[in-house]
Amino acid sequence: MLIKDEALRTAVAQALRVKEDEITPDKMKELINLQVPGKEIECLDGLEYAENLERLNAFNNKLETLDPIRDLRNLEYLDVSINQLRDIQALHGYRQLKHLDISRNNLYTMDVSSIAAMIDLKYLNMENSKIDSIEYLEHCKKLEEVSINTENVQYSFAILGTLKQLKKLKMARMRLFNVEDLTYLSSVEELDLSTNLMDDLSPLLSMTELKKLNISNCPYIKDYNILKQFAHLRILDISQNHPDSFAFLKDLKNLEELYMEQSGFTDMSLLNNLANLRRLNISKNEVKGLNKFTNVKHLTAFSARFCQIENIDFLKDAKELIHLDLYTNHITDMSVLKNCKNMVDLNIARNHVKDISCLNQMKQLSILSLEDNDVKDISVLSNLENLCNVDLYNNVIEDLTPLSKLKYISYLRLDHNAIHDLKPLSHLKFLRSLTLKANYITDVSPLKDLELLEALRLDDNPIEDTSVLESMQFYDKFTD
């Protein structure tokens, strides 16, 4: 066989639309784009004939060498992340490459000197790979996006300052005690320094075009006043940090997205000056003064998980909401959401809600989580034809009739309710996952024609006979 690895051979045959024994060196020249992620491929032998290949995605395999593709001079996109590569010497001379992902090849310290010749490279991801140096990047003047995270490195990052087209830089989880090497990076617009140990952000002041900054889980940063000097800052993540004061937020008037999960934030009135705010996450904080938070008109996404919220009247004018996550609070009344007609994803699980009639106008709703509430009447769901993922775990639902015409539902969780009759589910042809544990079901025959059903849980039900399900394609996977 021209291609030794069976999984690779099958994928190539599919890409070329031929039988495996019809793969020839000439036929391989027709291969332009090959996608083989997660196939457990061990070698690329045979791909040397694909001389016109432009894109190769081989992430999450078992590759130890790239030697078979060393002469593919048309390759511009290469993803070999999550493999077992010792080095990338086979890519020496790959001047044409524009996109390279070698992340998560962390079994060995890699020699990445071959990168020096990649003068057209625009994207480079080396996350979770043990690399010996980044000095080779000096020659890659067209780089726009770089991701690095190797812990306890001994080399300098100052070389990044020579990359004048660099727009996105990710250096998360590196245990950096200082970021002085970043002093001369003036072109960066998006920076991820999450999970590091520095306490001073002043080396970033040269990044006058900075628009997005992630410094979450950097516990030693206490003073954030310096952020006022980033005039173009649009997105900020300070989750898992604990600023000495949050007063600096009042001056970040251009912020569009703000993430402050588990940060000790309490005073919602500080956010009223952020007129451009669109996305906000304040989860795992004991927030106060919600009634004084009036800057909600333009919010499209709001997350407040584990905030001990009892009343959500402050959202009455949040009519542009698309994503709302209020998981685990003390909410009893959600009627204020009745005008959120653009809602796509709503999570109000683990609250004390009984009445969900306010969902009536949410015609775009596709993801709904109402687990651990007190809902009995779900008749309003019959109008929500776009629902595809529904979680109604642990309520007091008896009648499933409102679900009978929701033809796009693929995931449905109904455990711990009071359900007897499954007939309304018999026409949900796209249903792939269904859990019905701890109900009062005796007859499962309405499920027998659900051909796409892959996961089914029926534990703790007084079922009389399950033999009717034995002809279903995925019956062996079901957990009875």
Question: Which residues does each predicted region cover?
Answer:
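Concave beta-strand-loop units of leucine-rich repeat
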Residues: 30-42, 52-64, 68, 74-85, ...
